[in-house]
């Protein structure tokens, strides 16, 4: 009985209370606007903090991209309630050019092959778009285009290396909440892995666009796929048509 009484006391005064204690916002790397929007429970806060701590340990053993202060860069450009388009990526570029925004790279880095194909589709469908000589997509993010990788870090030279450390539950939570709380949004899901996230999105109020990934590997593949090719998918035109119909204002895709 004494042992059971101690167990009950520990459960009430230690373990339960520990779960109720949250984590300071700065330790979650997220801006206050996003912390307010996500309303992470104390348990979820601790879970996210554990993933961040895990990545910090991995950084002592190998080079990890992007730098910690860039991991949540996708959340810095606009109020979450102002997001109009969500473009999902997989994990960051693993060659040192990742800047925290899916598909984007900082000025001074070559335009990656997948982004070149994105530019090609933009030019095909929107003749006023001229492919720039850089890969910085900050201008899109500032207009309400959320460029979110589903995995937020990667080891140098090893794509997919951080797929199982715990980022996916967090980005799934972000996607689900955006679907729940936004009135109308365009979700662009390119490739099979991004397409799997369609189940998190309410397609009755949002426009969900899927196609193959813009990578040259996917575009040059001769294997049959249920998804249409990226080039020719018309997603950027369809997105602006939807936004205009909803009275939200179009995205200026020019860079």
From Swiss-Prot:
<feature type="active site" description="Proton acceptor">
    <location>
        <position position="91"/>
    </location>
</feature>
<dbReference type="Pfam" id="PF03167">
    <property type="entry name" value="UDG"/>
</dbReference>
<dbReference type="GO" id="GO:0097510">
    <property type="term" value="P:base-excision repair, AP site formation via deaminated base removal"/>
</dbReference>
<dbReference type="InterPro" id="IPR005122">
    <property type="entry name" value="Uracil-DNA_glycosylase-like"/>
</dbReference>
<keyword id="KW-0227">DNA damage</keyword>
<keyword id="KW-0234">DNA repair</keyword>
<comment type="similarity">
    <text>Belongs to the uracil-DNA glycosylase (UDG) superfamily. UNG family.</text>
</comment>
<protein>
    <recommendedName>
        <fullName>Uracil-DNA glycosylase</fullName>
        <ecNumber>3.2.2.27</ecNumber>
    </recommendedName>
</protein>
<dbReference type="InterPro" id="IPR018085">
    <property type="entry name" value="Ura-DNA_Glyclase_AS"/>
</dbReference>
<dbReference type="InterPro" id="IPR002043">
    <property type="entry name" value="UDG_fam1"/>
</dbReference>
<comment type="function">
    <text>Excises uracil residues from the DNA which can arise as a result of misincorporation of dUMP residues by DNA polymerase or deamination of cytosines. Therefore may reduce deleterious uracil incorporation into the viral genome, particularly in terminally differentiated cells which lack DNA repair enzymes.</text>
</comment>
<dbReference type="GO" id="GO:0042025">
    <property type="term" value="C:host cell nucleus"/>
</dbReference>
<keyword id="KW-0378">Hydrolase</keyword>
<keyword id="KW-1048">Host nucleus</keyword>
<dbReference type="InterPro" id="IPR036895">
    <property type="entry name" value="Uracil-DNA_glycosylase-like_sf"/>
</dbReference>
<dbReference type="GO" id="GO:0004844">
    <property type="term" value="F:uracil DNA N-glycosylase activity"/>
</dbReference>
């Amino acid at each position: 009985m004494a042992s059971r009484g101690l167990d009950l006391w520990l459960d009430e005064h230690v373990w339960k209370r520990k779960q109720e204690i949250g984590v300071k916002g700065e330790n979650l790397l997220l801006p206050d606007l996003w912390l307010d929007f996500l309303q992470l429970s104390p348990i979820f806060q601790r879970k996210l903090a554990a993933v961040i701590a895990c990545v910090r340990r991995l950084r002592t053993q190998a080079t990890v991209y992007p730098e910690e202060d860039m991991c949540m860069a996708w959340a810095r450009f606009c109020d979450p309630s102002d997001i109009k388009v969500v473009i999902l990526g997989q994990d960051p570029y693993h060659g040192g050019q990742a800047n925290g925004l899916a598909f984007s790279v900082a000025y001074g880095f070559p335009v990656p092959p997948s982004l070149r194909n994105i530019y090609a589709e933009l030019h095909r469908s929107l003749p006023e778009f001229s492919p720039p000589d850089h890969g910085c997509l900050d201008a899109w993010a500032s207009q309400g285009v959320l460029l979110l990788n589903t995995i937020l870090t990667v080891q140098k030279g090893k794509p997919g290396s951080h797929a199982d450390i715990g980022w996916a539950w967090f980005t799934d939570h972000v996607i689900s909440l955006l679907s729940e709380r936004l009135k109308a949004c365009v979700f662009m899901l390119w490739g099979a892995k991004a397409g799997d996230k369609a189940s998190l999105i309410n397609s009755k109020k949002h426009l969900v666009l899927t196609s193959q990934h813009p990578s040259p590997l996917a575009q040059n593949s001769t294997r049959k796929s249920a998804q249409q090719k990226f080039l020719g998918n018309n997603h950027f035109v369809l997105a602006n048509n939807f936004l205009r119909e909803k009275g939200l204002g179009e995205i200026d895709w020019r860079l």
